[in-house]
Amino acid sequence: MNELPGTSDTPLLDQIHGPKDLKRLSREQLPALTEELRGEIVRVCSRGGLHLASSLGAVDIITALHYVLDSPRDRILFDVGHQAYAHKILTGRRDQMADIKKEGGISGFTKVSESEHDAITVGHASTSLANALGMALARDAQGKDFHVAAVIGDGSLTGGMALAALNTIGDMGRKMLIVLNDNEMSISENVGAMNKFMRGLQVQKWFQEGEGAGKKAVEAVSKPLADFMSRAKNSTRHFFDPASVNPFAAMGVRYVGPVDGHNVQELVWLLERLVDLDGPTILHIVTTKGKGLSYAEADPIYWHGPAKFDPATGEYVPSSAYSWSAAFGEAVTEWAKTDPRTFVVTPAMREGSGLVEFSRVHPHRYLDVGIAEEVAVTTAAGMALQGMRPVVAIYSTFLQRAYDQVLHDVAIEHLNVTFCIDRAGIVGADGATHNGVFDLSFLRSIPGVRIGLPKDAAELRGMLKYAQTHDGPFAIRYPRGNTAQVPAGTWPDLKWGEWERLKGGDDVVILAGGKALDYALKAAEDLPGVGVVNARFVKPLDEEMLREVGGRARALITVEDNTVVGGFGGAVLEALNSMNLHPTVRVLGIPDEFQEHATAESVHARAGIDAPAIRTVLAELGVDVPIEV
């Protein structure tokens, strides 16, 4: 097992191997414990690629919840789950944190199969409230007695699923606690009317900063708690006036706050009184993303998931690599300068999708809808109906949430919407919840959607140009990772649906596009009889070239960074069958099972789509493959 960098004196944390050990500490010891937890999290995250700022901001509420509740009997749910590092440490996984998100190590999110203390498996936003409601309903139906508490960020609360669940929670009236962790951030800055309402609540200053502020907050809460319990609706000590302007109250959910989310002793005091109230209650806490680490507090967007850094100084080496996200961002920003119809829509992924510069250069043609993928797609449909050329910039794993909108709102009317799909394929350390290995399959099933897989930044630009100048919905998918930068003004002319022969050889031909093409070229580089085709379009296929290679080669190998179920390989087999061509075909792709976290290269090897795996298949097909020493 790996060791954490640096050393630290953690006398309190050393005593804790589970929640029961935490309860043995006095309340007066809790602030010191939270400082030790923050130091531990900083050391864990200093290796890079982990969720630092959000985890630091949630330390106090996680500590308070475990101090008051009885996990795993009581169920504590975390929305998204990336902020739950303190939860993992306090529930007996401290010695596994050095290997978090590594192959064979623990997940970076909560995961039911990992620990009895992880109430849900999660990675996507806005799911916790519906899960919590289901648990509360099941508890009551089974005649059991335990608490259900869900921790959700203000960013996740912008998601329609969370708001819809909140509406049902208020209607059902079951006992449960919702902790609204308000740090004004998701990954990018939060947007939308709900975010503005949350800021309005903070402005009212129902808690004060400075010495003695916590006591004042507690005193302010006492009367409203009594009012809530007696259902007096017109108390002069209500937190808001009138109550009807508060959407939580309007939904039938008791609201308390906002309170200081970094005073662990006062959070304990509050939780002890709130968890036993009948009906649903929201505790609104205000936190600072990156709390306790000055450089993370100053730049929470970068420190959300930083590269490797020195925990003492915050110094890090900026990456000089050119990412696919940057390639897309530069291309669409440049293209929009020449076409006033181009309008970019994204669901809370400005930084991740490479759109910071676009949002600055074209602020009136940029829309961040928050964590609301369905809204992003249908808003783009509305734009297209009015003659715009919207581009939806979205991660593959999140496009899954808007399948119906792509089908119903875009494809049926063959609208001019371009989907630029980042993080397509295996993403690596974030694991099963974030791998983008289904988009080829579900988009293939929608009539009229054309799908491209660029091999590099130049092809991405060519596909974007084609999509923005031709009618109908287009999908351009590209992986997480890096590509070669191309000069501004590079706009190659591509014909959609036309493949490219990259290596001669007619005995066995490998068909691959995107990331998989790199593996195919490497596998075949020293094999003269093995051809390689850049199958950069999955829909439509290049039937002319497929007929040619399918008629000559004795075997074809399709390779894709997508599930084998309904993917590129299936499309090739369907086409060959319709042509009455029957060469041997081997379909390589992601197996029909969820892939756990590891590096993308490791998962590709495990799935059998990397260069050595392709060479093994070539040998099985009778190709003379030199033995590698």
Swiss-Prot record:
SMART domains from the UniProt entry: Transket_pyr
Residues bound to Mg(2+): D154, N183
Pathway entry: Metabolic intermediate biosynthesis; 1-deoxy-D-xylulose 5-phosphate biosynthesis; 1-deoxy-D-xylulose 5-phosphate from D-glyceraldehyde 3-phosphate and pyruvate: step 1/1
Enzyme Commission number, as recorded: 2.2.1.7
SUPFAM superfamilies referenced in this protein's UniProt entry, alphabetically: Thiamin diphosphate-binding fold (THDP-binding), TK C-terminal domain-like
Source species, domain of life: Bacteria
Record's cofactor remark: Binds 1 Mg(2+) ion per subunit. Binds 1 thiamine pyrophosphate per subunit.
Record-listed thiamine diphosphate binding positions: H82, G123, H124, A125, G155, S156, N183, E373
Quaternary data: Homodimer.
Functional summary from the UniProt entry: Catalyzes the acyloin condensation reaction between C atoms 2 and 3 of pyruvate and glyceraldehyde 3-phosphate to yield 1-deoxy-D-xylulose-5-phosphate (DXP).
Family classification: Belongs to the transketolase family. DXPS subfamily.
The name this protein goes by in its record: 1-deoxy-D-xylulose-5-phosphate synthase
Organism for this UniProt entry: Deinococcus radiodurans (strain ATCC 13939 / DSM 20539 / JCM 16871 / CCUG 27074 / LMG 4051 / NBRC 15346 / NCIMB 9279 / VKM B-1422 / R1)
Record lineage: Bacteria, Thermotogati, Deinococcota, Deinococci, Deinococcales
Gene: dxs
